[in-house]
Amino acid sequence: MDLRYSVFSVNDHHPGLARTVPQLYQQVMRQCELAESLGYDTFFCAEHHFHEYGVVPDPAVMLSALVQRTKRIRLGSAISILTFHDPRRIAETYAMLDMMSGGRFVFGVGSGYLAHEFTGYDSQPAEKRDRFNENLGLVRRLLAGETLGWQGKFSKSEKAVLNVLPHEGRVPPIYVAVLAREAAFHVGKQENRIFTVPYASCKDFDDIGTMLAEYRKGRAEAGLPADDDDHVFTLHTHVARSDAEAQEQCKEAYDLYVDTRLYAKKHLYEDIIANGICLFGSVATVAAKMRRLRDMGVRHVATLQNFGALAPQLVESSMTLFAEEVMPKIS
């Protein structure tokens, strides 16, 4: 099976810099158009709230704009935080988006992990797993066209049925965000796909293979064939003509990006080069790491290339080198 490659846009904003939010939005839209022209599989858009950590609070709005600018590339939420939203509204919104895109929508979902977002939504972190599981089950059934009545722990309805279904009545592919190998196992056992960012979930590059193995172990326990699985591993990426040039171009932007990450551990440029959980470097360096991922059994890599207000021409140059010079070396 071919190794698929995509783009993940986290949409981090830095108010102290000259780039405005409208300018960031324009850059993101141009980068999606470029991704389509270069053959990237999917353009994923993050959801975040109440902080410059990410300034797209509703991926459906951004993805709707991208529907109008593209024809072929798949468009994904990464992720829709089901914990914070009414499941009926989520199902309606993304069914309509999938219909408008002609079936190109990819549904990344998660439960959230940032304390300030739970505070802003007056949501209890201790309830997030139960709330997520309840909402995901409802959203999936609504997208499938079922007429539902329910009395849940977190919501209820006498009767709900979508009046707009996804394209051709097909439920979009669903990916569940995970931050730990134990979660990867359970997602696999529940017959879901995983979406993960190894920066936040793995201790080093080889640990990516460990997480993938846990996911496949869960699938096996559910009686699913491993060679049928699908998953997304997202890696920070910058490709240049040499390793030194890559560092010169993106180190400052990457470290600025890391400064706004609200993780317990923050890996600066030197750290992420040392632990290997990135795709920074020359065409040869990045191609070698992509081959290692392929040999681990990874099937789908999302590249996070716009971070820290990196100059858009450098983002686009990296995207082009990755697609035109790195990927042909992987076959």
Summary of predicted features, one role per range:
Residues 1-3, 89-192, 206-213, 221:
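Internal, glycine-rich beta/alpha segment that forms the wall or movable "lid"
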Residues 1-75, 172:
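N-terminal beta1-alpha1-beta2 module of alpha/beta enzyme domains
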Residues 5-7, 43-45, 75-77, 105-109, ...:
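Hydrophobic faces of well-ordered beta-strands that scaffold small-molecule active sites
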Residues 7-9, 37, 126-161, 204-299, ...:
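An alpha-helical appendage that flanks or caps ligand/catalytic pockets
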Residues 11-26, 80-88, 168-179, 240, ...:
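Active-site mouth loops of central-metabolism enzymes
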Residues 35, 39, 47, 66, ...:
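Conserved, mostly hydrophobic/aromatic
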Residues 42-66, 81, 113, 199-203, ...:
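Glycine-rich, proline-tolerant flexible connector loops at the mouths of alpha/beta enzymes
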Residues 53-77, 131-135, 319-331:
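Alpha-helix-loop-beta-strand connector modules within alpha/beta enzyme cores
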